[in-house]
Amino acid sequence: MTSEFKLSPSILSADFSNLQLALDQCANGGAPWIHVDVMDNQFVPNLTIGPPVVKSFRSKTQKFLDVHMMVIDPEKLVEPFAKAGADMITFHIEAAADTLGIIDLIRSS
């Protein structure tokens, strides 16, 4: 039996002054997904990418955008990231007051 796996390089390691280069490297390297780490400087001690950047990514690539939210109150960001073009949204259950509600929100977005 063979296992299928998806390579999802994180854009977090990119040079933020040249994100287009990082998107091109992912495309040229054959990665089907791009992992987007979202940090709010509250749930984790770093501040990274928001919905406008994901919207920009979506306009530049058709790769699967895997958005990983490391944020307080993730329910507030589901719709903005979905509208920006995220293909998958994940969150930390310990940051959520209503885990099942957020899952339903993601599914409906």
Describe each region flagged by the PLM:
Residues 1-90, 94-98, 105-108:
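Conserved N-terminal beta1-alpha1 strand-loop-helix module at the mouth
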